[in-house]
Swiss-Prot record:
PANTHER family: HEMOGLOBIN FAMILY MEMBER, HEMOGLOBIN SUBUNIT EPSILON. This is Hemoglobin subunit beta-1. InterPro entries: Globin (IPR000971), Globin-like_sf (IPR009050), Globin/Proto (IPR012292), Hemoglobin_b (IPR002337), Hemoglobin_oxygen_transport (IPR050056). GO terms for biological process: hydrogen peroxide catabolic process. Gene3D superfamilies: Globins. It comes from Drymarchon melanurus erebennus (Texas indigo snake). It comes from the Eukaryota.
Length: 146
């Protein structure tokens, strides 16, 4: 995948302002609320019975932070996403058996959350750049499945 200087700049200009724990928590919470079947991968997280329980769940918050800290590695080095996520792809495929469509869903939710947080700053160009990045990350995470 070729990345232009403009795409990289658009991505980092927003990501440098992201509160990763807050955005990670919100994005993972939204995934579990909007797509409730994804909750089956998080049964060890305790109470996920409703939106309020999910949004206040400490394990959801911690895992959201972990997921989007890892996503930050893709932001830092978009040319090496496949290598960066090789072990996570193996984990999610071989051990957790996560359907790869869920990676795409979480990427779309991240875009929604960033747009909500950054408003007018999240221009169509920024959105297109993030769309490309979340697609590349989702593909890398699904790599082990092919």
């Amino acid at each position: 995948v070729h990345w232009t200087a403009e795409e990289k700049s658009a991505i980092t200009s927003i990501w440098n302002k992201v509160d990763v724990p807050a955005v990670g928590s919100e994005a993972l919470s939204r995934l579990l609320i909007v797509y409730p079947w994804t909750q089956r991968f998080f049964t060890s997280f305790g109470n996920l019975s409703n939106a309020a329980a999910i949004q206040s769940n400490a394990q959801v918050k911690a895992h959201g932070k972990k997921v989007f800290t890892a996503f930050g590695d893709a932001v830092k080095n978009p040319e090496a996403v496949k290598e960066t996520f090789a072990k996570l792809s193996e984990l999610h495929c071989d051990k957790l058996h996560v359907d790869p469509i869920n990676f795409k869903l979480l990427g779309q939710i991240l875009i929604t959350v960033l747009a909500a947080h950054f408003g007018k700053e999240f221009t169509p160009h920024v959105q297109a750049s993030y769309q490309k990045l979340v697609s590349v990350v989702a593909h890398a995470l699904a790599h082990r499945y092919h």
